[in-house]
Amino acid sequence: MRKTITVIAVLIVLALIGVGIVQYVNTSDDSDFIGQPGEPTGTETTEPPVQPDWCPAVEVIAAPGTWESAANDDPINPTANPLSFMLSITQPLQERYSADDVKVWTLPYTAQFRNINSQNEMSYDDSRNEGTAKMNEELINTHNECPATEFIIVGFSQGAVIAGDVAAQIGSEQGVIPADSVRGVALIADGRREPGVGQFPGTFVDGIGAEVTLQPLNLLVQPIVPGATMRGGRAGGFGVLNDRVQDICAPNDAICDAPVNVGNALDRALAMVSANGVHALYATNPDVFPGTTTNAWVVDWATNLIDNG
């Protein structure tokens, strides 16, 4: 029994710590993109919303992963973690576009999770809830001031969970902005990933998110990661945004490519230890998108959405 709990602990720490401390790699690729915005799904309007001239045409909202942000970080020029993976996406976009045309806003949130190795940190639930509230606040503020501005949302690891949750609310018409205001969403290493939900560019993986795999063990894992609720998948998926959500996962990433059932999870927990480094290598891993890297692909995908809407 002690050995089993130890293995579970290894899996949980693996599946939740996921620190994206990666080296910036600035590459590009002419890959085709799937799930671009198509015909409007709702009632068409005859006149576009009127907004001030200073409003950007597009706002990119980026949600960093665990330990890659801070609650008091600067959302326009974040410095909380200079090695944050999201910087390898946001900085090229800021260099490519004028801030008058494209606003790039990085989510400032605590980005922690309490576990057996860091009892003094904010719990995963509290960190995630804080990030979700701040992202929704930014969406509301921009949409109220600039109703014609459209959004591209990108998240990594814990940030992907936040971005995915917000996208699911918007897609089910329960969000803070209308779905027609969202051009696209990219989730990198989403802990709530499920097959058939969203689009899956790049290399196919048949695993699921760690929160989905570990949902049956939620009560058992609380002593190991107190305040980290394993919520499973997102009921209803991404709704009308399904074709606009890119769910990106590296093979053998324990966060998003976990075993489908708990029994296999226990058997494979030790094997996942050696694969844990995969989660920190999206900026250099050639196995996610052949011929390019994840950050370069996302930059090109976002550029295509900005230029071609």
UniProtKB/Swiss-Prot annotation:
Disulfide bonds join 55-146, 249-256. Pfam families: Cutinase. Its main location: membrane. SMART domains: Cutinase (SM01110). Belongs to the cutinase family. It is an enzyme of class 3 (hydrolase). The chain crosses the membrane at residues 5-25. This is Carboxylesterase Culp6 homolog. Esterase that may be involved in cell wall biosynthesis and/or maintenance. Hydrolyzes pNP-butyrate (C4). The active site is at 157, 253, 279. GO terms for molecular function: carboxylic ester hydrolase activity. It catalyses: a butanoate ester + H2O = an aliphatic alcohol + butanoate + H(+). It is a single-pass membrane protein. It comes from Corynebacterium glutamicum (strain ATCC 13032 / DSM 20300 / JCM 1318 / BCRC 11384 / CCUG 27702 / LMG 3730 / NBRC 12168 / NCIMB 10025 / NRRL B-2784 / 534). Keywords: Cell membrane, Disulfide bond, Hydrolase, Membrane, Serine esterase, Transmembrane, Transmembrane helix. It is found in: Cell membrane. Its EC number is 3.1.1.-.
